[in-house]
Amino acid sequence: GSGSAATDKFKAERATADTSPERLAAIAKDALGALNDVILKHGVTYPEYRVFKQWLIDVGEGGEWPLFLDVFIEHSVEEVLARSRKGTMGSIEGPYYIENSPELPSKCTLPMREEDEKITPLVFSGQVTDLDGNGLAGAKVELWHADNDGYYSQFAPHLPEWNLRGTIIADEEGRYEITTIQPAPYQIPTDGPTGQFIEAQNGHPWRPAHLHLIVSAPGKESVTTQLYFKGGEWIDSDVASATKPELILDPKTGDDGKNYVTYNFVLDPA
């Protein structure tokens, strides 16, 4: 299914973690204990157990573990990271980040197709500062988001490379002004076992419209986050459980028909 699109990228990254055997044993014990407690609490039957085993096999064979984990688990890992931060709230990265997107000046327009240009423009501006409010010269704002049909470049063959992606270099005061388009809500892929998982519970596969960002500066802790839109559909029932009140934008429409919004990022020291 289409949910496997992020798997090759994840394999290429070869994730590592400096985790001691003792810590791993403690986590594994608690995780398996919690799962066994659920089985006992709900009286899971052998037919249900066999269906679960087959579903686990299907997720692996379908290449959907990155999709499933990023949608249903990553928000808790991000919540652990957030405990140590004083600056801008983070959110999940999701499966569609591509590093080394083209560098763009502090005032710029994201790469887009002619059909993208017909969508309502969004002018997104702000400043990157430290905890004391000092602008961070040359800070990087990596921005990516789906098109109006819910597709991400590099994960949809019909889109040109780097469509609606860029690494914006802030000016000497840490300021930026980026013109892009107003994104739309979209469904996560539903044609594989992740979709079956959602459908079996009468759930929905929708994510509210959002921007993805990674903001960084020398000597500072980078922040990975998402920004949402006030009043947006699905904002109160995000399938990925990733929305936060502090990350909701409220754009205003200008006389020129464009939507304008400002959001400032505050970075913790590294």
UniProtKB/Swiss-Prot annotation:
One annotated GO biological process: catabolic process
Keywords per UniProt: Aromatic hydrocarbons catabolism, Dioxygenase, Iron, Metal-binding, Oxidoreductase
Cofactor note: Binds 1 Fe(3+) ion per subunit.
Name of the top EC class for this enzyme: oxidoreductase
Cofactor: Fe(3+)
UniProt-annotated binding residues for Fe cation: 152, 186, 210, 212
Catalytic activity as recorded in UniProt: catechol + O2 = cis,cis-muconate + 2 H(+)
The protein's Enzyme Commission number: 1.13.11.1
GO molecular function term, any single one: ferric iron binding
Gene: catA
PANTHER family: DIOXYGENASE, PUTATIVE (AFU_ORTHOLOGUE AFUA_2G02910)-RELATED, INTRADIOL RING-CLEAVAGE DIOXYGENASES DOMAIN-CONTAINING PROTEIN-RELATED
Entry's family note: Belongs to the intradiol ring-cleavage dioxygenase family.
Keyword match Oxidoreductase: yes
Native source organism of the sequence: Rhodococcus opacus (Nocardia opaca)
Annotated protein name in UniProt: Catechol 1,2-dioxygenase
